[in-house]
Regions:
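Low-complexity, acidic/polar, glycine-enriched regions of mature
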Residues: 1-165
């Protein structure tokens, strides 16, 4: 197994304040939320080193499509358990210029002082759904092959926007 990771995530999140301030008063179902997040393909770093970074970037057509973008279409609140709030998210994921609908469970973790919240989740996608041919580095003479399925795991920390900023 090899994995790629990025520490650089951009975007915005607008969320109903009641979800963070008084989740016990929120009923299950759709909530008011907007979000868009992106990751620069070039910021993804492989566990296997720079050679695999280049292979991955080429497979993802990084020069033509430099960003991976997720746009939230719907967020449905399921339940709150202490500082953890559980949701189902639906949206569009664009990779290599190809957009697909995705849905996955999301957990929101509130800090005690409510200054920051963390969204985390996991979903699976197939490279071929985004017209990406799973890379097989030529230096390995076909000995290394990558499967089609990819597990996307994310953790996105957001802070409250201060008034006037």
């Amino acid at each position: 197994d090899w994995h790629a990771e990025s520490q650089l995530v951009g975007g915005f999140l607008e969320l109903d304040g009641a979800l963070v301030n008084a989740p016990e008063q929120v009923k299950p179902g759709k909530v008011t939320a907007q979000a868009e997040t992106f990751v620069a393909v070039r910021s993804l770093k492989c566990s296997s080193g720079k050679a695999m970074d280049a292979v991955m970037q080429e497979a993802m057509k990084e020069k033509q499509h430099p960003r991976i973008v997720f746009k939230l279409a719907e967020l449905a609140f399921k339940e709150a358990k202490g500082a953890l709030l559980h949701f189902d998210a639906k949206g569009s994921l664009t990779v290599s210029g190809v957009t697909q609908s995705v849905s996955f469970p999301v957990t929101l973790t509130r800090r005690v002082d409510q200054s920051r919240i963390t969204f985390s989740g996991t979903t699976g996608v197939k490279m071929t759904d985004f017209k990406i041919t799973p890379p097989a580095p030529t230096a390995a003479v076909g000995l290394i092959k990558t499967g089609d399925e990819v597990k996307l795991t994310f953790e996105w920390v957001v802070a409250k926007k201060e008034a006037g900023k």
